[in-house]
C-alpha cells in the first residue's frame, strides 16, 4: 500500500512517545505529506492557538511515494501554524531525511506540548528515544548534525534540526536537513525552538516496498523517469544550470523585483546568474560552482554546490567557510541580491551559507533587508541603529545583517521579526512586500498577473510554490499564456494550486511538474497504493487539501481582506521592460477566483463546497 501504516506521537511535555495506526481513510482522502499532515493538524488543534505556545502542534509527514523508486521521492513536509503569518504553515524539503523516516517504518511524527529542557528525538526503526539535547543547544545546523552522528557512531543517520535562528525563535527560522536542504518558509523552525526540540535523527533499515503491484510500479516509475529525461527543463536546464537558470530569463521578461520592488529589472542580474556561477573568477581562475547535486531518488539533480573566493571580504579570517556548501538557488540569489540591489555573487553565497548554518529562510530575510534599506534611504533608520551604512547595493551591509539576525545581536532582533512587523513598527507598513505577513518570492505580480493572484490567495502567505503559474506565463508549460492578461488567470491559478497540492502530498518534488502532469503521477500511485488514484481523483484530492487549508485560515481569523497585494503593486506601475506601465489586476481576478473555488464574497467556503469535497 506504500504507506508505512503508522505514525509516531510525541508528547514533549510528558516525554512520552507512542505509536499509532495511520488513519487509512484519511490517507486515501488526503494522500500524505502536506495533505495528510494538515488533516491531522486541523482535526486535533484549535486554529486560534498562539503559534509559539505549547498548544500548537508540529508535524513531520512523508507521502506514499516518499522513499520509493519514484523519481524525486525524497520529499517531506513540516506542518504547523506559522508564527510569521498566523496561518497554516506547510513547508516542504528534499534531501534524504524524508526517505529515511519512511524506511524506518513511519509515515509521520506528531509533536505536541513543550519539553521542559532541550531534547532531540532519535528514531532507529521501531526503537524511539527522546534524548537530552542540552549539549546541542546553541550549536549551528552544521555542528548539530555531525555531533549527533558522532554521538551514536552512525554516519548514516539523517538529521532534521534547527540552528540558532530556531532556538531564538526568529519568525522565519527554518528546519534544515542534510546540512543544506530546508523546510524554509513560514517560521516552522521557530515553532520547533519554542518546544525546546532541537532535532529529529533517523536511521531506517526496513526499506519501502509494500506496493499493490510491484511490477506495475517499476514500469510506471521507469516511464515517468523517461519523461523527465526527455524534457528540456528537467532533462537539460535544471541539471546544467539549476534553478538559477531563471535569473536572466525573468530579468528579460521585466519581472525581477529589484530594490524592494521599486524596480522590475536589475542591471546586475548577469553578475548573479547561473552563467556567472559557472564562469571562472579573475581572482583565482576558479568558478564558484563546483558541481550539481541530487536529493534522494532524484533524476533531475538541480542542487548546486559552490565555493566562495577565499580572498573575499566576507570570509577573510574565517577558514571554516573555505569549503564547499549548498547553493545558490534562484530564490535565494534573488532575495539576497536583486531585492537589495546587490550584485556581488560571493557575498550572496556567503549570506546563503549563513542562512543554512543558522537555519533561516533567505527569501524572507532578503526581502526584509530590502525594506530595511529603503527605510534607511528614507532617513527612517540610521547608521547608528543599523551598525552600518545600508544603502541599496551594499554587499557589506548584507553580510553584516546576515551575521547578526539569528544571534539577535543589535538590529538583528528587528530583522528577526520579518518585514511586515518591522515596517509597521517604523510607520511604513506599505514597504513590506508580503501577503499575510510572508514576503514575496522572485517574480513581480504586477507584470505577471497570474502569479500576483497566486500570491494573494496562497494559504501560507506569498509563495510561488503553491501555484507556479510562471510555468505557463513565462515558460509556456503546459501551454503559453500571456503574462499581462488577466482573463483566464483565475482558472489557471486554481488549476496550478490544486495540482501542486496533489504533487506535494504524494511525496514528490514539484519540479517534476515541468515535465509531468497528474497523468504521469497517477499510474505510479495506482501501482503503489490502489486503483482509486485516477487523475480525476487526484485533482479532487488537491482541491480538497487547498480548501481544508483555507478553512483552517478562516477559523484562525483570515478573510477576503487578507487576499491582497501591497499598495506598491496596485498603484506604482512597472518602470521598464516588456511590462512597463503595468499594475496588478488583482481586483479584476479575485471575484472570479472565489466563484471557481466555491467561496462566498468574504472568502469563506460555501456549504455545497464543503459537501462536495467531504470537508
Language model features: what each stretch is:
Residues 1-92, 96-615:
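Intrinsically disordered, low-complexity segments enriched in small residues
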Amino acid at each position: 500500500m506504500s504507506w508505512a501504516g503508522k505514525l509516531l506521537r510525541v508528547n514533549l511535555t510528558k516525554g512520552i512517545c507512542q505509536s499509532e495506526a495511520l488513519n487509512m481513510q484519511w490517507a486515501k482522502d488526503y494522500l500524505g505529506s502536506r495533505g495528510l499532515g494538515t488533516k491531522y493538524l486541523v482535526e486535533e488543534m484549535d486554529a486560534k492557538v498562539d503559534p509559539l505556545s505549547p498548544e500548537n502542534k508540529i508535524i513531520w509527514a512523508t507521502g506514499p511515494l516518499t522513499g520509493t523508486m519514484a523519481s524525486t521521492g525524497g520529499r517531506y513536509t513540516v506542518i504547523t501554524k506559522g508564527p510569521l503569518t498566523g496561518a497554516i504553515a506547510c513547508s516542504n524539503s528534499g534531501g534524504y531525511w524524508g526517505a529515511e523516516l519512511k524506511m524506518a517504518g513511519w509515515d509521520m511524527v506528531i509533536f505536541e506540548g513543550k519539553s521542559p529542557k532541550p531534547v532531540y528525538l532519535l528514531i532507529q526503526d521501531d526503537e524511539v528515544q527522546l534524548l537530552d539535547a542540552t549539549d546541542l543547544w546553541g550549536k549551528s545546523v552544521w555542528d548539530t548534525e555531525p555531533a549527533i552522528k558522532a554521538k551514536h557512531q552512525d554516519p548514516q543517520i539523517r538529521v532534521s534540526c534547527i540552528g540558532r535562528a530556531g532556538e531564538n525563535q526568529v519568525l522565519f527560522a527554518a528546519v534544515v536537513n542534510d546540512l543544506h536542504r530546508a523546510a524554509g518558509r513560514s517560521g516552522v523552525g521557530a515553532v520547533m525552538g519554542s518546544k525546546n526540540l532541537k532535532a529529529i535523527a533517523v536511521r531506517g533499515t526496513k526499506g519501502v516496498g509494500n506496493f499493490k503491484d510491484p511490477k506495475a510500479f517499476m514500469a510506471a516509475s521507469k516511464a515517468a523517469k523517461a519523461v523527465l529525461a526527455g524534457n528540456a527543463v528537467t532533462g537539460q536546464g535544471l541539471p546544467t544550470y539549476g534553478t538559477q537558470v531563471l535569473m536572466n530569463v525573468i530579468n528579460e521578461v521585466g519581472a525581477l523585483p529589484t530594490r524592494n520592488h521599486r524596480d522590475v529589472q536589475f542591471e546586475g542580474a548577469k553578475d548573479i546568474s547561473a552563467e556567472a556561477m559557472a564562469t571562472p573568477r579573475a581572482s583565482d581562475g576558479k568558478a564558484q560552482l563546483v558541481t550539481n547535486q541530487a536529493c534522494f531518488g532524484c533524476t533531475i539533480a538541480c542542487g548546486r554546490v559552490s565555493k566562495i573566493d577565499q580572498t573575499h571580504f566576507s570570509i577573510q579570517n574565517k577558514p571554516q567557510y573555505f569549503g564547499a556548501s549548498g547553493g545558490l538557488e534562484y530564490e535565494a540569489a534573488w532575495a539576497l541580491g536583486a531585492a537589495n540591489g546587490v550584485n556581488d555573487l560571493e557575498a550572496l553565497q556567503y549570506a546563503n551559507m549563513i542562512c543554512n548554518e543558522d537555519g533561516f529562510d533567505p527569501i524572507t530575510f532578503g526581502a526584509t533587508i530590502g525594506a530595511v534599506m529603503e527605510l534607511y534611504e528614507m532617513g527612517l533608520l540610521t547608521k547608528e541603529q543599523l551598525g552600518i551604512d545600508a544603502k541599496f547595493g551594499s554587499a557589506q551591509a548584507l553580510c553584516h545583517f546576515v551575521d547578526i539576525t539569528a544571534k539577535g545581536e543589535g538590529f538583528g532582533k528587528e530583522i528577526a521579526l520579518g518585514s511586515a512587523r518591522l515596517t509597521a513598527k517604523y510607520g511604513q507598513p506599505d514597504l513590506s512586500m508580503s501577503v499575510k505577513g510572508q514576503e514575496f518570492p522572485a517574480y513581480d505580480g504586477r507584470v505577471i498577473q497570474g502569479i500576483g493572484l497566486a500570491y494573494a490567495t496562497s494559504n501560507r502567505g506569498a509563495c510561488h510554490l503553491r501555484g507556479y503559474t510562471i510555468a505557463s506565463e513565462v515558460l509556456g508549460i503546459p501551454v503559453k499564456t500571456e503574462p499581462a492578461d488577466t482573463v483566464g488567470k483565475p482558472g489557471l491559478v486554481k488549476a496550478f494550486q490544486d495540482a501542486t497540492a496533489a504533487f506535494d502530498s504524494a511525496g514528490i518534488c514539484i519540479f517534476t511538474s515541468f515535465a509531468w502532469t497528474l497523468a504521469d503521477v497517477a499510474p505510479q500511485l495506482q501501482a503503489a497504493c490502489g486503483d482509486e488514484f485516477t487523475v480525476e481523483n487526484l485533482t479532487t484530492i488537491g482541491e480538497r487539501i487547498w480548501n481544508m487549508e483555507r478553512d483552517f485560515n478562516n477559523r484562525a481569523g483570515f478573510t477576503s481582506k487578507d487576499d491582497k497585494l501591497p499598495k506598491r503593486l496596485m498603484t506604482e506601475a512597472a518602470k521598464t521592460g516588456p511590462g512597463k506601465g503595468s499594475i496588478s489586476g488583482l481586483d479584476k481576478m479575485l471575484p472570479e477566483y472565489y466563484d471557481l473555488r466555491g467561496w462566498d464574497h468574504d472568502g469563506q467556503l460555501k456549504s455545497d463546497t464543503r459537501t462536495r469535497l467531504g470537508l
